[in-house]
Amino acid sequence: MVMKNVLLVGAGGFAGSVARYLVALAVPFSGTGFPFATFAVNLLGSFLIGFISELALSTTLLSPEARLLLTTGFCGGFTTFSTAMYETGGLMRDGEALYASLYVAGSLAGGLACLFSGTLLAKLWQ
């Protein structure tokens, strides 16, 4: 049972990491230095984990294994706190304190808003 769960998380993490990489390739780096790709995947991942978790908790649509695959696995691999902090440090190092502050504040506030939006949409969808 434990090995099955480890494999589910690994498979989801692989898919999420590849998806994040593809978003980074698709979203051009702006001349401002603002990390739009990481910002977008973290907000989308927050929405997805809210939506998936609500469905898993309040319906029988997702098995515990599917929830593990999609939340801990995919969303965990898709989103990236460490990259966000690395990029924030880079903005600070480059003298872009305003962008760094907006990035951190926007990531936290936007992430929570997306999480709750995903949860609400799942409740309405049921």
Swiss-Prot record:
GO biological process, one term: cellular detoxification of fluoride
Transmembrane regions: 6-26, 32-52, 68-90, 102-122
Compartments, record wording: Cell inner membrane
Keyword Membrane: yes
Binding, Na(+): G76, T79
Activity regulation: Na(+) is not transported, but it plays an essential structural role and its presence is essential for fluoride channel function.
Topological relation to the membrane, as annotated: Multi-pass membrane protein
Alphabetical UniProt keywords: Cell inner membrane, Cell membrane, Ion channel, Ion transport, Membrane, Metal-binding, Sodium, Transmembrane, Transmembrane helix, Transport
Function: Fluoride-specific ion channel. Important for reducing fluoride concentration in the cell, thus reducing its toxicity.
Family: Belongs to the fluoride channel Fluc/FEX (TC 1.A.43) family.
Name of the protein described by the UniProt record: Fluoride-specific ion channel FluC
Organism of provenance: Chlorobaculum tepidum (strain ATCC 49652 / DSM 12025 / NBRC 103806 / TLS)
